[in-house]
Amino acid sequence: LVLLAPSWLAQQKLLNICAAAVADLDTNFNTSKSYTMIFEPFNRTRRVTFEFPSLALNASQLCVVSSFMYLGHILSASTADNDDIAHQMSLLYARANVLIRKFSKCSRNVKLCLFRTYCTNFYGAALWKQYNATVLKRFKAAYVKCVKMFFGYDRMYSVTAMFIELGLPVFSTILHNAKCSFVASISVHANSVVRVVHAVCAYP
């Protein structure tokens, strides 16, 4: 469950409504696993205050965090995607190491099938919009390094020639395809609210 509100008071009212609703169902929230996050404005000169009263749920104060993982995607109070990109990069290294350890002796065709399945899908990549260029460059370098290690290429081998020989998508192609697929899916989504939000974001 995610609650979004434009002000502290509105957020507290939503929490009170939720607490009353679950009380009617004779159940309760696990406040130890409930968190609150205050998103920073894009224009920091318009920030009203740097401190807010603690939000409470069932008379328990909620912990304020600067980042939180929700449905596999790391959300940051600064709305930047650097943390999520770094997380996906670490997952790529982990998956590549497993493939190298267990399937290094397989044929190239088998390796290509495995690599396409496990190392060319970056969860949430279609949502990346605000990030430091250096963070994405490190991720790109990590992707190239994983390809060279798994397929046994020398570290000084031409990256362009390697991808042409293997027929694998380059890093920028993976990101582009992810965004195109995401936009195509939400533009025909069955939920009218999702379609309206997409239309507003696409044509501000």
Residue ranges with predicted function:
Residues 28-66:
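Short, conserved micro-motifs composed of acidic
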Residues 21-28, 153:
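Secondary-structure transition/capping motifs at alpha-helix termini
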Residues 30-35, 39-42, 67-196:
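Non-catalytic, peripheral interaction segments enriched in hydrophobic/basic residues
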